[in-house]
Design a protein with these regions (language model features):
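Short, well-structured N-terminal submotif of metal-dependent ribonuclease cores
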Residues: 1-42, 56-62, 124, 136-141
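A residue-level structural signature of the nucleotidyltransferase/glycosyltransferase Rossmann-like core
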Residues: 5, 40, 77, 114, ...
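Alpha-helix/helix-capping structural signal
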Residues: 11-12, 46, 120, 133
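Active-site-proximal, substrate-binding regions of enzyme catalytic domains
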Residues: 28, 38, 48-76, 81-83
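Short acidic, glycine/proline-enriched helix-loop-strand junctions
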Residues: 64-85, 122-141
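Active-site neighborhoods of divalent-metal-dependent phosphate/nucleic-acid chemistry enzymes
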Residues: 76-119
C-alpha cells in the first residue's frame, strides 16, 4: 500500500511517550512508520493541548517540550476548517465531540485511517478507525 495518510489519535501518542503497557510497542511502530515516511501521519491541532495537559503529571515542562518536538518531526499538524467544525457540531450521533473533531481533521487531509486505541468511539466516523496493531497488519499485506 502506497501513499497512505493517517491521523494519529492523542491516545496513541500518549501510549508512546509514557511507554504505557500494553500499547507502547504498537504506538512506537506507528510513530516509526510516520517518521520514516512509510505513511504520512497527521496529528489534530487540538490534540497537542490534550497531550500537553496529560503529560504534566509524567514529566516537567522542558521534557514535554522536547517530546512534542520529537513527535512533530514524525507527524504533521492539521486542523479543521470553519465549515468542518460546523459540520462536527451538527453530527450529534457522535458520542464524544472530541472524537468527532478528530474525524473532521482526518477528513481535512483526506486520511484513509484514524489510528486509535478507542476504535469503538469512532463507530460513526466518516474515516475508518483502526488500532495501531491492526494497521500494522494491514500495511504488511
Amino acid at each position: 500500500m502506497k501513499n497512505i495518510v493517517v491521523l494519529v489519535d492523542a491516545n496513541v501518542i500518549l501510549d508512546y511517550v509514557t511507554t504505557r503497557d500494553p500499547y507502547y510497542h504498537d504506538a512506537y511502530k506507528i510513530i516509526d512508520m510516520c517518521h520514516s515516511g512509510i505513511v504520512k501521519g497527521y496529528l489534530a491541532f487540538h490534540s497537542i493541548s490534550i497531550i500537553w495537559y496529560v503529560l504534566r503529571k509524567y514529566m516537567p515542562d522542558a521534557d514535554r517540550r522536547s517530546w512534542l518536538k520529537k513527535i512533530l518531526q514524525a507527524l504533521h499538524v492539521t486542523g479543521a476548517s470553519h465549515e468542518l467544525v460546523l459540520k462536527a457540531v451538527d453530527m450529534d450521533y457522535f458520542m464524544d465531540f472530541e472524537d468527532c473533531l478528530q474525524d473532521r481533521c482526518a477528513e481535512s487531509v483526506n486520511a484513509q485511517y484514524i489510528i486509535t486505541n478507542n476504535v469503538k468511539d469512532f463507530k460513526e466516523s466518516v474515516i475508518t478507525a483502526i488500532t495501531p496493531r491492526d494497521f500494522e497488519r494491514l500495511i504488511k499485506q
